[in-house]
Design a protein with these regions (language model features):
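Bacterial Sec-dependent N-terminal signal peptides
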Residues: 1-8
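Sec-dependent N-terminal signal peptides
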Residues: 8-16
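C-terminal motif of bacterial Sec signal peptides marking the signal peptidase cleavage site
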Residues: 19-23
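Bacterial signal peptide processing site
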Residues: 25-27
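Short, well-ordered surface patches within globular domains
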Residues: 29-91, 95
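A well-ordered secondary-structure block
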Residues: 88-166
Length: 166
């Protein structure tokens, strides 16, 4: 449970960083908004935890499925933001905007995530809000960031395989 609280702090730090996105980009992206969001978040997570995780395909799919299953077209979340699969030691959380709505990013906000200022804001927010120790980070075996675009908003979730503490 302690690890879940720490991971929730990580995700809330991400929400704070995502909330800082206000500038608009004017370039046409080569990747979809969802792919851009996934790339930016995995980079920011790695810098925050001082790791070098790849965006694990299985975990990315868990995150995408959570968004598809739990987030309505209006951004409202059904049955909570957290998905825990104790048998497979997987935890997934959808980035929240408030207590009942997922954080929906516009295409302009997603494009802004490429800016190094986003990564710096995320890292600073994460380090300020999280109390993950090196031992906690070492228990993370794989991470994945999944994003799904519904209508004009892109929703982001994080999934991780976590080795239980002994």
């Amino acid at each position: 449970m302690k690890m879940l609280k720490k991971m929730a702090a990580l995700l809330l730090a991400g929400v704070m960083a995502l909330a800082l996105l206000t500038a608009c980009g004017d370039e046409a992206p080569a990747k979809s908004a969802a792919e851009q969001a996934e790339d930016a978040m995995i980079l920011a997570l790695n810098q925050s935890m001082e790791t070098d995780f790849k965006n694990d395909e299985a975990m990315k799919n868990v995150a995408r499925k959570a968004i598809t299953d739990k987030v309505g077209d209006d951004g409202k979340v059904k049955d909570g933001f957290l998905v825990v699969d104790r048998e497979n030691k997987v935890m997934c959380m959808i980035f929240p905007a408030d207590q009942s709505t997922a954080l929906g990013l516009t295409a302009e906000q997603v494009a802004q995530m490429k800016d190094p200022a986003f990564t710096k804001a995320f890292v600073d927010s994460f380090r300020g809000a999280s109390n993950l120790t090196k031992d906690d980070v070492a228990r993370i075996k794989a991470i994945g960031v999944g994003a799904v675009t519904k209508g004009d908003k892109t929703y982001v979730a994080f999934a991780a395989t976590i080795q239980p503490a002994h």
